[in-house]
A protein has these predicted regions:
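N-terminal secretory signal peptides that target proteins for export/translocation
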Residues: 1-9
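Conserved functional micro-motifs across diverse proteins
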Residues: 32-210
Length: 210
């Protein structure tokens, strides 16, 4: 009984955090999340399960969707970390969205890893094609001090949150491209998301109602 109580408290805390985050981050994030009925705190996926990654001769690029319907499928500690990040950067994201005139941008985390010394990267060259439409970043909120240098040493990384116009669907196949390279690995992620979504709903349904 004690173990069940602890587990329930943890899930309750994560759920409360999700509610708190939605009340603090900009309205575009609240609006998108409010439409998602997927409960918080029942996911088990790891970040590596949903990251799209590919490499050039100098860089490895990782693309992580930050849509609520995706990150709610992650393990509670991982969701909590990303939710806290969105909360911390909420004002910067709101300002970036306002500058571009996009009310509800799609948020994506992009990471560049240096594979060689003095590896150069071009942030604006990361694009997403969804439903036959090419989306280019309309705003970028850097998370790493070295972002503006556009250059990395070997094993060094630069991370940022990208803002794209609304319209990218993470429920369907899509393609991430960078300087002539294209990766459609997200199509292979979809079955994993579908299975985990069903499991999350099943786990949540087994919990006693308050």
């Amino acid at each position: 009984m004690e173990r069940w109580t602890v587990r329930t408290c943890v899930r309750t805390s994560v759920a409360l955090l999700g509610t708190a985050v939605l009340s603090i981050v900009p309205s575009f994030q609240r609006s998108a999340s409010a439409q998602d009925t997927l409960p918080v705190g029942y996911g088990t996926l790891k970040r590596d399960d949903i990251v799209v990654r590919f490499a050039t001769d100098q860089l490895e690029i990782q693309v992580l969707p930050l849509a609520e319907q995706v990150i709610r499928l992650l393990a509670p500690d991982t969701y909590r970390s990303l939710a806290q990040l969105l909360k911390t950067k909420g004002r910067d994201l709101a300002d970036a969205a306002q500058r571009t005139g996009v009310d509800r941008p799609t948020l994506v985390m992009v990471t560049f890893f240096g594979l060689l010394p003095q590896a150069r990267f071009s942030p604006e060259d990361v694009n997403i094609t969804s439903r036959g439409r090419l989306f280019r970043p309309v705003g970028i909120v850097p998370l790493s001090p070295r972002w503006s240098s556009y250059q990395l040493d070997a094993h060094e990384q630069a991370v940022a949150i990208y803002l794209f116009e609304e319209g990218i669907s993470f429920h369907e196949g899509l393609t991430v491209s960078y300087q002539g390279l294209a990766n459609d690995a997200w199509t292979g992620v979809l079955p994993t998301l579908d299975r985990e979504r069903a499991r999350v709903m099943a786990r949540a349904s087994l919990q006693p109602r308050p």
